[in-house]
């Protein structure tokens, strides 16, 4: 197989989300969350998620049943559920399971990939032009260009992400982590709001917010209890790419 053969990205379809949120949360790791704007593409690799299981999950917004606020989570799979929390930021979720059955996945952290300067600006973070560290490999196929390098054995890439080799790299990673490490941060970086995005299809080719698979291979996944919640806090429903520096919060043991 040609090692420079393009890796084709594919838009995730509704069937991907039409299953148990735990399976979806794990499978989303390594995929790209993409926002199309008039000023260009914003994209981040999904590195951390949490599953919410519906009416049997005390921490889920659907635990007490269907309301006008949470109705998206009872609808078809693959739709954005956005809520406002703590009076200062939005959180993005995607609906799972068949229409009428509640369930969803929260996006907790992204590794910035494309449009980093624009995302930083949206977050109020100043990054000098030309000083942004580039990923060792950017999933350009997912953004409308040809990707390079594929695995001769599988056709899937397994790059761990940003290469950290010097102290200066650690400082840059620390700065970039402020862009989209955490559910509120990633929503602000991708300009996600409830008014703009709640109820939006993430599986439509016409949507300006979508999730694509660019054949990135996740090597190892860590599973822990969810964080930042009081109810059902010990259930192991948080998933993240092991060793990725953009994961938010501390890693509690399952």
List where the protein language model places each region.
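N-terminal polybasic/positive-inside topogenic patches
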Residues: 152-153, 160-161, 165-168
């Amino acid at each position: 197989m040609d090692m420079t053969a393009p890796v084709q990205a594919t838009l995730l379809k509704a069937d991907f989300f039409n299953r148990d949120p735990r399976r979806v949360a794990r499978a989303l790791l390594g995929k790209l969350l993409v926002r199309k704007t008039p000023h260009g593409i914003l994209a981040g690799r999904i590195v951390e998620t949490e599953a919410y299981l519906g009416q049997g999950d005390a921490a889920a917004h659907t635990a007490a049943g269907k309301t006008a606020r949470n109705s998206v989570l009872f609808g078809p799979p693959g739709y954005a559920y956005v809520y406002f929390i703590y009076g200062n930021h939005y959180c993005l979720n995607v609906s799972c399971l068949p229409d009428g059955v509640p369930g969803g996945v929260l996006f907790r952290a992204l590794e910035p990939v494309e449009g980093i300067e624009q995302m930083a600006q949206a977050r109020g973070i100043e990054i000098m032009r030309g000083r942004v560290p580039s990923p060792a490999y950017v999933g350009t196929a997912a953004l409308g260009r040809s990707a390079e390098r594929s695995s001769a054995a599988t056709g899937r890439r397994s790059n761990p992400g940003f290469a950290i080799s010097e102290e200066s790299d650690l400082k840059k990673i620390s700065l970039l982590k402020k862009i989209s490490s955490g559910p509120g941060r990633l929503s602000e970086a991708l300009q996600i709001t409830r008014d703009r995005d709640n109820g939006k299809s993430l599986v439509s080719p016409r949507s300006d917010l979508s999730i694509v698979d660019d054949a990135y291979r996740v090597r190892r996944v860590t599973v822990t209890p969810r964080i930042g919640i009081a109810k059902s806090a010990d259930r192991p429903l948080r998933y993240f790419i092991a060793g990725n520096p953009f994961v938010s919060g501390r890693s509690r043991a399952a």
